[in-house]
């Protein structure tokens, strides 16, 4: 591994770095690259660009490769010399290239890079020892570049970043064609000489470069030899290393012993340590996304997915596509089988898509690449148009990235729709990622319609299976104009709710929404397929009815008008109004909310927020509406009791009790559960015939608060029984 630069009598020329170059170095180191390890990415990227260039030239002139057919990149750490060397067999540089590219012709950084791109410049040459090269000084105190172009002699460039660099003809080891970059590492950067660290950085940043990257390491192994051979070994050691890099010559030693066993059975052997050069290719996983999807097997996709994500399970679905035209990029997207446990954690990185530019890894946490609701998608996007040295700030402004994002979202939705045709797999997908789809409906107005087609819910007619809104619409009655839904905590709770009684009795299907995120979802999803979504827990529920039903409703309103007024007076500010219900069958009453207020379920969710905004709570927890069932015996008897004596204290007590019970059954919480409990206990006492005045010794007399109106005597008790 000769890395020394031979100084002959040749002329050494010294050049000053241009001031702009010094500024550029400062800009690169301080602005774009906070982590030092990217120097390796930049140098490998430069090597890859140089290899691209010679490969391109060889297409029209195969003789260009006479100086070296193999296109490769070698990495050679040398702990003794504290150097890290990268060798490529790319196009190399002439003396003029070396002087111009590495120091005397300034580039004004990113701006020039973007302008050159828009002007149609050869993208691979811009990266070649342009901006990225200087990142070598993050880890190196001195850099030596030895290069050989087919059209020129071999030259060496050297600089310790002190404002100047030298160039001279190099008469050291001929490199054929290409470039050798020798980094003399700073004392505190020797980690980049370690096998583990180099492998880690290459895997992270340059795993999918299109040329083999080989790591050369000097290692030791034990070798068994006889005493007689020990002396010979010393002399032959270097030759053997070259002839046999991978295998020790133990078999040869063994056969010698067998040959000599007749002469000297007691010949001794001993183990010595020999040094050898170990070669390991670091990027065996080739960029699968650059291949034709028709040529790739599911097993290959599976292997790539596991190497990309470190997942132990296979992926659920895959989408492999390329976009060409004004913009060119390829993408490979995977849906995992299960959601990660921290899918919605704030501190977690926002997405799992790795962004590459021409097979060079740029970043894996680009927020602009995919919307947050699709953050479970894993994969890679490889752009041909973005500049290699792009920063996060530039990505936010990039029009190219906006187009890429739009295409990714479109392809993800296509993938979900394809998956929906396979019921078994879609069920697994929906269990894991339904929250993401609903979040998408809340956030992504452009794709809301397509996302709504992917939703699945239990309904009053679907049994144990979930159904889509499209299937619901196909089953709607001719007279039905709306999609009816109810939100709540569980399927059992909403199925037995008072709100769905009449709707179900009339044969209309009700969608059961039982996840907290459904509340946010339906705030944005006002209609589906031209049918409005109507909550059965809010005021203004209109069911299709014939003339007879309308007439009956009008009669009920007139008959119970006085009771409604009385109940409103008793409940006062607790309710906004009391009305006759068209939604109840077996329940005496229920609490509904205003059309734009929160449902009981939403109120429960918001109260559970640790960082809730109490000012919002005030007006969104809208006044409640009490609806009473005119066909229920409790309500009818209460009407008769009120007609007889509207000042009857028992009527007041029963109205409050009905209201509080309706609050609970409608999914609300009580502001004062203790008062409600005491009211119930008194009813129990009445039912058991216990005298109100009998207070046990243990029972504190203050147990019944003053504000609860006392129930009347036995006469009222008998009336209570009538109600029962």
Curated annotation (Swiss-Prot):
The modification Phosphotyrosine is found at residues 301, 305, 484. Residues 222-270, 694-724 are annotated as: Disordered. Residues 2-214 are annotated as: Interaction with BIRC2. GO terms for molecular function: ATP binding; ATP hydrolysis activity; ATP-dependent protein binding; ATP-dependent protein folding chaperone; disordered domain specific binding; DNA polymerase binding; double-stranded RNA binding; heat shock protein binding. In the resting state, through the dimerization of its C-terminal domain, HSP90 forms a homodimer which is defined as the open conformation. Upon ATP-binding, the N-terminal domain undergoes significant conformational changes and comes in contact to form an active closed conformation. After HSP90 finishes its chaperoning tasks of assisting the proper folding, stabilization and activation of client proteins under the active state, ATP molecule is hydrolyzed to ADP which then dissociates from HSP90 and directs the protein back to the resting state. ATP binds at residues 46, 88, 107, 133, 392. GO terms for biological process: cellular response to heat; cellular response to interleukin-4; chaperone-mediated protein complex assembly; chaperone-mediated protein folding; negative regulation of apoptotic process; negative regulation of proteasomal protein catabolic process; negative regulation of proteasomal ubiquitin-dependent protein catabolic process; placenta development. ISGylated. One of its GO terms (cellular component) is perinuclear region of cytoplasm. The record marks 126-127 as: Cleaved under oxidative stress. Residues 620-723 are annotated as: Interaction with NR1D1. Transmembrane segments: none annotated. Belongs to the heat shock protein 90 family. Molecular chaperone that promotes the maturation, structural maintenance and proper regulation of specific target proteins involved for instance in cell cycle control and signal transduction. Undergoes a functional cycle linked to its ATPase activity. This cycle probably induces conformational changes in the client proteins, thereby causing their activation. Interacts dynamically with various co-chaperones that modulate its substrate recognition, ATPase cycle and chaperone function. The TPR repeat-binding motif mediates interaction with TPR repeat-containing proteins. This is Heat shock protein HSP 90-beta.
């Amino acid at each position: 591994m000769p890395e020394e630069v031979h100084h002959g009598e040749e002329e050494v020329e010294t050049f000053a770095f241009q001031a702009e170059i010094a500024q550029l170095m400062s800009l690169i180191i301080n602005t774009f690259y906070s982590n030092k390890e990217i120097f390796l990415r930049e140098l490998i990227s430069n090597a890859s660009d140089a290899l691209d260039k010679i490969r391109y030239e060889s297409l029209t002139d195969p003789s260009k490769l006479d100086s070296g057919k193999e296109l490769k990149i070698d990495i050679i750490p040398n702990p003794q010399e504290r150097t890290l060397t990268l060798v490529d067999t790319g196009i190399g540089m002439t003396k003029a290239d070396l002087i111009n590219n590495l120091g005397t012709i300034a580039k004004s950084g990113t701006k020039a890079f973007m302008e050159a791109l828009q002007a149609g410049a050869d993208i691979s040459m811009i990266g070649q020892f342009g901006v990225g090269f200087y990142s070598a000084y993050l880890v190196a105190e001195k850099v030596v570049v030895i290069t050989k172009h087919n059209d020129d002699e071999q030259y060496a460039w050297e600089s310790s970043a002190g404002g100047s660099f030298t160039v001279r003809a190099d008469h050291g080891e001929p490199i054929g064609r290409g470039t050798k970059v020798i980094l003399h590492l700073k004392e505190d950067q020797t980690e980049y000489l370690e096998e583990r660290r180099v492998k880690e950085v290459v895997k992270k940043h340059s795993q999918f470069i299109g040329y083999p990257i080989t790591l050369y390491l000097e290692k030791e192994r034990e070798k068994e030899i006889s005493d007689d051979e020990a002396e010979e070994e010393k002399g032959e050691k270097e030759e053997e290393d070259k002839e046999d890099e991978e295998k020790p010559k133990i078999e040869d030693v063994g056969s010698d012993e067998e040959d000599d066993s007749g002469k000297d059975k007691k010949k001794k052997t001993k183990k010595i340590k020999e040094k050898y050069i170990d070669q390991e290719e670091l990027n065996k996983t080739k960029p699968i996304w650059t291949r034709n999807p028709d040529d790739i097997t599911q097993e290959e996709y599976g292997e790539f997915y596991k190497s990309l994500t470190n997942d132990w399970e296979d992926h659920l679905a895959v989408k492999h596509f390329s976009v060409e035209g004004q913009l060119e990029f390829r993408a490979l997207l995977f849906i995992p089988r299960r959601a990660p446990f921290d899918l919605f954690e704030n501190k977690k990185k926002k997405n799992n898509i790795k962004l590459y530019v021409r097979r060079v890894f740029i970043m894996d946490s680009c927020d602009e690449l995919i919307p947050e609701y699709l953050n479970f998608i894993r994969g890679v996007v490889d752009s041909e148009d973005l500049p290699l040295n792009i920063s996060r700030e530039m990505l936010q402004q990039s029009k190219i990235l906006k187009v890429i994002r739009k295409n990714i979202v479109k392809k993800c939705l296509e993938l979900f729709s394809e998956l929906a045709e396979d019921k078994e797999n879609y069920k697994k997908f929906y269990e894991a990622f339904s929250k993401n789809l609903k979040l998408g409906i809340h956030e992504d107005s452009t794709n809301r319609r397509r996302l709504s087609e992917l939703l699945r819910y239990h309904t009053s007619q679907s049994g144990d299976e979930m159904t889509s809104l499209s299937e619901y619409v196909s089953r709607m009655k001719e007279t039905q104009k709306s999609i009816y839904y109810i939100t709540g905590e569980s399927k059992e709770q909403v199925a037995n709710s008072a709100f769905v009684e009449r709707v179900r009795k009339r044969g209309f299907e009700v969608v059961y929404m039982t996840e907290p995120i459904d509340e946010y979802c339906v705030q944005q999803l006002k209609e589906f397929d031209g049918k409005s979504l109507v909550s059965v827990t809010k005021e203004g529920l209109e069911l299709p009815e014939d003339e007879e039903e309308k007439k009956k409703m009008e009669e009920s309103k007139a008959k119970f008008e006085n009771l409604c007024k009385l109940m409103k007076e008793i409940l006062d500010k607790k309710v906004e109004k009391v009305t006759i219900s068209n939604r109840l069958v077996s329940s005496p009453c229920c609490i509904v909310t205003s059309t734009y207020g929160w449902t009981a379920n939403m109120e429960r969710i918001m109260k559970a927020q640790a960082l809730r905004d109490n000012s919002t709570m005030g007006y969104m927890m809208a006044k409640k509406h009490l609806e009473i069932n005119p066909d229920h015996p409790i309500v009818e008897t209460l009407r008769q009791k009120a007609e007889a004596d509207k000042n009857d204290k028992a009527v007041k007590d029963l109205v409050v009790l009905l209201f509080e019970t309706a609050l609970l059954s409608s999914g609300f919480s009580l502001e004062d559960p203790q008062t409600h409990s005491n009211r119930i206990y008194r009813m129990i006492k009445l039912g058991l015939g216990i005298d109100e005045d009998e207070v046990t010794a243990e029972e504190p007399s203050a147990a019944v608060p003053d504000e609860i109106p006392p129930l009347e005597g036995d006469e009222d008790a008998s009336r209570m029984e009538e109600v029962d």
